[in-house]
């Protein structure tokens, strides 16, 4: 392929990212990811913030992961501070896929407790990928402040994030079980159950946790 031909393909793909058809936008993102070009990075990041189609957003993220982190991190780190929730969420999601720990300082307590559930869930996933080993316990403590939050998907996302940290979460879950609000206690108990039994269904773990909380502290129900 000549340089002129490549330049034309890049121009066509960048234009395709703004097409009214989601299938055209999807193909454009695929094309860019297949033949990465630094000139496309800014547009990919920009589109992540506003792209309405989930499949296209996933392809945009994939295309960004195909470029060198030195090129993608600056734009993505700027987006996590955006006022637009989708920009924050998709940037965090992409950072979790890139997995470059230079992004860790950008995962702030504010993002981990973001009022938007999608942003918070993306922040949790990114955090457990990027956190340095020596900060895992501190991260578990921050994540535990969100126990009991939201509906099923949000709670399951938080449980998975906590479980990904491993057994360092046990003291944190124990504290939440002993002193938390009922919803947080239920969530903490269910999360510990899933840590020890990954094959258990989340709904079953929650229902079991509700019974434990209703009866009192864990272990009392058999007394």
Residue ranges of predicted features:
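Ankyrin-repeat and related helical/solenoid repeat scaffolds used for protein-protein interactions
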Residues: 137-187
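Alpha-solenoid HEAT/Armadillo-like helical repeat scaffolds in large eukaryotic proteins
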Residues: 12-16, 43-51, 75-83, 106-114, ...
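Eukaryotic acidic, Ser/Thr-rich intrinsically disordered low-complexity regions
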Residues: 174-223
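Structural detector for internal amphipathic alpha-helices that build alpha-solenoid repeat scaffolds
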Residues: 1-6, 12-15, 22-37, 46-47, ...
